[in-house]
Amino acid sequence: MGGAIQGFGVESTSMEHGFLHSTARAYRVVLLNEEATVLTVDREHEIFNVIPGSFNTVGLVVAVQVELLLLDGHWMDIEYRLALDRAAMLRTVHSLHSLRGDDRVDSVECLRIDGADNVFLIAIGTVVAAPSAAVFSMDRWWHHFYHFHLFHDVVGGDGTALLIERESIELKQFLFRHDRGAFWVIHDDPAMWFLRHFGFMRFLFGHMLAAEDLYRFRRGCARSVDASRWSAQ
């Protein structure tokens, strides 16, 4: 199932509903008595909920039905907040509790810059025409790594001020440049150190890799666009 998880690209694409068992709609399982059956939330729900983490002790999962979503036309409206010390970070975390239960908010994340500064990302999934303040657009021939954009364009060089407090980024670009897609993993791999040190390598890979080649699952957008959903097995 590891190959299927990676192939569908649903293992970690959402901070909210990222794991395969949170994404799956049905399992086709061969039980220990060699009987093949389909498990869903509505049918055999007790066994369905036991499958994740059972390590094949219940049965062998041979197929999974998942929900996929077309990302065209979806954007992430991102608000940035900067905390310069631990006290400010704790105050920011406390203030973010008011966002709990807000269906508009897809995720809240904290990234650290140079081990000291903390940038909070409050991401809201939207379905709109291309905003005028978009950072990434598909007609641009060069795209930054997201964290490069964050550390150089969003936060000032001295790390003490936000240069951009709010922006919109095309969802497939946000997921592809920031989330655990191939681009992010390759760049963070110590064995691929040359990607960090040579600008022409970032240029080369940034030009060659396109977000349209990577299908991503995002439950937050599925709440607003039912017509774009389908199931794949």
Where are these regions (language model features)?
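Noncatalytic alpha-helical scaffold of FAD-dependent oxidoreductases
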Residues: 1-233
